[in-house]
Amino acid sequence: MARANKLLDQILRGGADANIPFSGMVQLLKRLGFQERVKGSHHIFFLDGVAEILNLQPQSGKCKPYQVKQVRNVIINYRLAGKADAPDTKS
């Protein structure tokens, strides 16, 4: 859980958008309650109550910086940061 909180803090600070690991971003979004659908290299995340659909693609094991910014804006606009502290109930 500490690793997820560290990644969330890093994303919210916005200082290193080019250095966010893709696998960590996927885990964080699932922890926030997003559902994932995969089509090829596109990982599509959606959540009830959130109008935006997040479409992420890995690039050399990292997230693309503009996609990290999109995720940050969704987390801030919908106040999802507190949900990352909740225990993960999905396996």
Place the predicted regions along the sequence by residue.
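Basic nucleic-acid-binding interfaces
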Residues: 2-39, 48-91
